[in-house]
Swiss-Prot record:
The gene is rubB. It comes from the Bacteria. Keywords: Cytoplasm, FAD, Flavoprotein, NAD, Oxidoreductase. The keyword Thylakoid does not apply. Belongs to the FAD-dependent oxidoreductase family. One of its GO terms (biological process) is alkane catabolic process. GO terms for cellular component: cytoplasm. It comes from Alcanivorax borkumensis (strain ATCC 700651 / DSM 11573 / NCIMB 13689 / SK2). This is Rubredoxin-NAD(+) reductase. Its cofactor is FAD. It catalyses: 2 reduced [rubredoxin] + NAD(+) + H(+) = 2 oxidized [rubredoxin] + NADH.
Length: 382
């Protein structure tokens, strides 16, 4: 009997195995990962400096421990070269692995802007525990960090690094914090909260180049001609679902790997979930949808075909300088924001023309309204 093969040992991969083992203790499972296979919580990567956590501190279990606890074969440092969907085979550089069912839990890649300069290779991004360890080593004993990108990850790192004692400069060309998630007044509240920690914002220009400076520092050149000096540069522009492996195997892809509500791809016996998946048009790189997907997929793998449903799934952004909870309206929703603001406390409600609540953004003390508002919202994907 060929094993279930899971490619990826992030939250999506490990949680699928945990849920599956509640239903089936014995079916062989092989997990393949290109990294070191340590189990950790990805959201903690942008909260580690405040708590003084090293990469080892954030590791919840070694691959050996996971293998023992969940009766699974975890193979680390493995590069998957391709998928032969016809013959149900994962292709490795010097071998292959036959599967009964294949789960793609590939995650997403960080997107780095097209920068010039002789220090481009020294720009960090933090997308996994190994990245975090390298970044933490790089900032050891340093004082200043330039962050490229003022979205969710950029703002979380700005807050975390400031709390960790670093002087932070943040570059965001769209002109405000969290521009794709929040209306303007809520963005401004987050900006004020971070500014109070000492974060210096550079709204409007793009980062063009990163050079070595004369004094050992890095110089980030912006499109308006200004220059920022810092010890370290961190790119937090955004994430792109990893789809190349699936695409090369002939699976249908769009923004992510396309699946139905049962997380089945266009190829028989192949499933996808988490940051790499596009489920019925939804790309939701957040923890709550991932956990719902893992529970549903575990049942399907155990023989009970189960569709995933996404209820109301608010996103909590870890910026304690100005707490944020947001529940974005579905893409293409028509409506308008109703905003009440007092200082850094903002309640922004996105309503349709008939007054139905379609989404919200809450900052400061208004985050306490989350549970009440959740009851009014429609499910993301019933």
């Amino acid at each position: 009997m060929h094993p279930i093969v899971i490619v990826g040992t992030g939250l999506a991969g490990f949680n699928t195995v945990k849920e599956f083992r509640k239903l089936d203790k014995e079916t062989p499972i092989v997990m393949l990962t290109a990294d070191d296979g340590r189990n950790y919580s990805k959201p903690m990567l942008s909260a580690g400096f405040s708590k003084g956590k090293t990469a080892d501190d954030l590791c919840m279990a070694t691959p050996e421990k996971v293998a023992e606890q969940l009766n699974v074969d975890v193979r680390t440092g493995v590069h998957v070269a391709g998928i032969d969907a016809t013959n149900k085979r994962v292709l490795l550089p010097d071998d292959h692995l036959d599967y009964s069912k294949l789960v793609l839990a590939l995650g997403a890649d960080t997107w780095t802007p097209p920068l010039e300069g002789d220090a481009v290779g020294e720009v960090f991004s933090v997308n996994d525990l190994m990245d975090y360890g390298k970044f933490r080593a790089a900032v050891e004993g340093k004082k200043t960090v330039t962050i490229l990108g003022g979205g969710l990850i950029g703002c979380e790192f700005a807050n975390d690094l400031s709390n960790g004692g670093f002087k932070v400069s943040l570059v965001e060309p769209m002109g405000r914090c969290l521009p794709l998630l929040l209306p303007e007044q809520a963005s401004e509240a987050v900006g004020r909260g971070l500014a109070d920690l000492g974060v210096q914002f550079h709204f409007g220009p793009l980062a063009k180049a990163v050079h070595h400076g004369d004094n050992g520092q890095l110089v980030t050149e912006l499109s308006d001609g200004s220059q920022l000096e810092s010890d370290v540069v961190l790119s937090a522009i955004g994430l792109r679902p990893r789809i190349s492996l699936a695409k090369e195997a002939g699976l249908d892809t769009n923004r992510g790997i396309l699946t139905d509500k049962s997380l089945r791809t266009s190829a028989e016996h192949i499933y996808a979930l988490g940051d790499c998946a596009e489920v019925q048009g939804h790309v939701l790189p957040y923890v709550l949808p991932l956990m719902a997907s893992a529970r549903a997929l575990a049942k399907t793998l155990a023989g009970e075909t189960t569709e995933v449903s996404y209820g109301v799934m608010p996103v909590t952004i870890k910026t304690p300088a100005c707490p944020v909870v947001v529940c974005p309206a579905a893409e293409g929703s028509e409506g308008a924001w109703e905003v009440e603001a007092e200082g850094n406390t903002v309640q922004a409600l996105f309503r349709s023309k008939d007054g139905s609540l379609l989404g919200y953004a809450l900052t400061g003390e208004a985050v306490k309204e989350k549970m009440k508002l959740n009851k009014e919202l429609p499910a993301i994907m019933p």
